[in-house]
């Protein structure tokens, strides 16, 4: 018997509520003009990678647990002597999420992880790049429920980039606000 796949909450909300709201607010002529979240890139840069080359693979395992997708170990493109970095040396890990996994991750980020961040006052509404993409940083990866706090030997930060099809920052801001992203006012 085939198992029925469940649609992520945020995806359902996007197609049933958010699209109509954005259509009314920005008066799009075509349904394809309505902005949507294209992909989410989660990156961990490990500063101690020059000392211990096993750290990026440990970070990749944690990132895989957080996102539900296998992480890729990122390597140095060229050597930088002042940072003791050689070309090809592992420096971190990254994951690119699309479709259902992306919506599931955004749901966990907004509802569980961000409220657990220490001294959280909201996301900076100026962190858009001018083309509708939003970037944010989290200082501790242990805010995600998938990480067992007792088994963690090192706490790493991570960068989360939300890429949208929005043409302007205002459109992207409204899209993410509709997804309940807690922006500072």
From Swiss-Prot:
GO terms for biological process: translation. This is Large ribosomal subunit protein uL5. PROSITE patterns: RIBOSOMAL_L5. Part of the 50S ribosomal subunit; part of the 5S rRNA/L5/L18/L25 subcomplex. Contacts the 5S rRNA and the P site tRNA. Forms a bridge to the 30S subunit in the 70S ribosome. One of its GO terms (molecular function) is structural constituent of ribosome. The keyword Cell inner membrane does not apply. The gene is rplE. This is one of the proteins that bind and probably mediate the attachment of the 5S RNA into the large ribosomal subunit, where it forms part of the central protuberance. In the 70S ribosome it contacts protein S13 of the 30S subunit (bridge B1b), connecting the 2 subunits; this bridge is implicated in subunit movement. Contacts the P site tRNA; the 5S rRNA and some of its associated proteins might help stabilize positioning of ribosome-bound tRNAs. It holds the Pfam family Ribosomal_L5_C. It comes from Bartonella quintana (strain Toulouse) (Rochalimaea quintana). GO terms for cellular component: ribonucleoprotein complex; ribosome. The keyword GTP-binding does not apply. Belongs to the universal ribosomal protein uL5 family.
